[in-house]
From Swiss-Prot:
Active site residues of this protein: 201, 295
A family per Pfam: DDAH_eukar
Catalytic activity: N(omega),N(omega)-dimethyl-L-arginine + H2O = dimethylamine + L-citrulline; N(omega)-methyl-L-arginine + H2O = L-citrulline + methylamine
Name of the protein: N(G),N(G)-dimethylarginine dimethylaminohydrolase
Stated family: Belongs to the DDAH family.
Recorded GO MF terms: dimethylargininase activity
Binding positions for substrate per the UniProt entry: 102, 127, 172
Purpose of the protein: Hydrolyzes N(G),N(G)-dimethyl-L-arginine (ADMA) and N(G)-monomethyl-L-arginine (MMA).
Catalytic class of the enzyme: hydrolase
Phylogenetic classification of the source organism: Bacteria, Bacillati, Actinomycetota, Actinomycetes, Mycobacteriales
């Protein structure tokens, strides 16, 4: 069961992990000129936060006693929406539904690639109604939604890197769903165990920057998962705790421009050093529900 107490950011975090890299070490730029990065036009889906609220606590970031300003959430969300349009991307808008406050976290609704749409099967009953809403939307835009027998929480735990899917498990998505996803998509799936409930979805601890490059926060993963990531992505950007705990890795990249929480300043510097263009946005009101940029953004892969 997830710890629903609000996270503590004091020094006990450092003591908890035997494996720890200091932020100053992690943020050090690599020697040499950065690689040339090329943006690619993307298609996204988003759901306006018209009914956003923290009405229950199903992750450590949610505090039902903390007030939520829906108008601020809507303004921050709209800024993100306009940022994608300004960068040249297209955005499908999904109609929000009253009683489903977490629909704004559209990435969790499914996984779409190669004309195949897998609809989420949520772990918590509070979000079960979203599956029907997203399946209906998928059908309305021409897909035939595919369901899984086991829990999968969409792009919250399923991230595409080139022609490979990185798949998280440990808190939400059932590892047994990974084989189902691989069979449906016809793509290799790499299972990665998450071990810190504050990083309950893969997209809170790992960001895909282009078809060959990722950034991640190692302490969120098991030792075996860290070894897998190190072997698969030896040039990955390793992010420190200061940026991880403001959900800096809950980011969206088009291959050049990386939209990320504005508070993740160290990660932004790392991105610049690696040849990317960080684009900071403030989604602090939506972070109260345990989500940020990527959570609000479902990428529709071609």
């Amino acid at each position: 069961m997830e710890n629903t107490q609000r996270p503590s950011f004091d020094c006990e975090i450092r003591a908890k992990y035997r494996w720890f890299m200091t932020d100053s070490y992690v943020a050090a730029a690599r020697l040499g000129s950065p690689a040339r990065r090329t943006p690619r036009t993307r298609r996204y889906a988003m759901t306006p936060p018209a009914f956003f609220a923290v009405a229950y606590a199903i992750n450590p970031w949610m505090d039902v006693t903390a007030p939520v300003d829906v108008q601020v959430a809507q303004a921050q969300w709209e800024h993100l929406h306009q940022t994608y349009l300004r960068l040249g991307h297209s955005v499908d808008l999904i109609e929000p539904i009253s009683g489903l406050p977490d629909m704004v976290y559209t990435a969790n609704g499914g996984f779409i690639a190669h004309d195949i749409a897998v609809v989420a099967r949520f772990r918590f009953p509070e979000r079960a109604g979203e599956s029907r809403a997203y399946a209906s939307w998928m059908s309305s835009v021409g897909y035939r939604p595919v369901t899984t027998r086991h829990v999968n929480e969409g792009q919250g735990d399923l991230l595409m890197v080139g022609e490979r899917v990185l798949a998280g498990y440990g808190f939400r998505t059932d590892q047994r769903a990974h084989a189902e996803i691989a069979a449906v998509l016809g793509l290799p799936v790499v299972s990665l165990e998450l071990v810190d409930p504050r990083f309950y979805h893969l997209d809170t601890a790992l960001a895909v920057l282009d078809d060959h490059t990722i950034a991640y926060y190692p302490p969120a993963f098991s030792t075996a998962a860290q070894e897998q990531l190190s072997a698969l992505f030896p040039d990955a950007i390793v992010v420190g705790s200061a940026d991880a705990f403001v959900f800096g890795l809950n980011a969206v990249s088009d291959g050049l421009n990386v939209v990320l929480p504005v508070a993740a300043m160290g990660f932004a510097a790392q991105l610049r050093a690696a040849g990317f263009e960080p684009v900071g946005v403030d989604l602090s009101e939506l972070l109260k529900g345990g989500g940020s940029v990527k959570c609000c953004t479902l990428e529709i892969h071609p």
